[in-house]
């Protein structure tokens, strides 16, 4: 994919992955700016951990109780509600909650609808993220549409496309 900038594209439908992080809010702010400029609609996507699939993972090995799906879903719904409040009323916005691993769910959601771009924040996992693979890296390498990743670096905000 070419090195496109968000400002260079005419956008109608944006998929914005939100997780409550500062970098996620930066991605949402960039989406709002683009939506106002292009009269575009925004879909906010939050991916909740699927408790049934994660129950056999690290938490079980560590002896922790399995995660409560209702709590996980409620946290994702709250993240979506907080994100909706950041979108001006003149922008059409809808919420989408999915369960699973964030990277594959974001890519799947994008493939299931006619979005022009995906915007998401980088969590800044550093070397560990590089070893295990970050959500933003997964989305950038697997999505069929442009992906824009916002970064929050030590209190300094920047956005990369």
Identify the residue ranges that each predicted region occupies:
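Short, hinge-like loop/turn segments at secondary-structure boundaries
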Residues: 59-63, 112-114, 136-138
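Small/aliphatic-rich secondary-structure junction motif
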Residues: 3-63
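A short acidic, glycine-rich active-site loop
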Residues: 62-78
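Short secondary-structure boundary segments
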Residues: 46, 121-123, 151-152
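Glycine-rich, Arg-bearing micro-motifs that act as flexible, cationic patches
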Residues: 117-141, 156-159
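Structural beta-alpha unit
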Residues: 1-9, 23, 84-118, 154-161
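General small-molecule cofactor/ligand-binding pocket signal
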Residues: 43-45, 94-98, 148
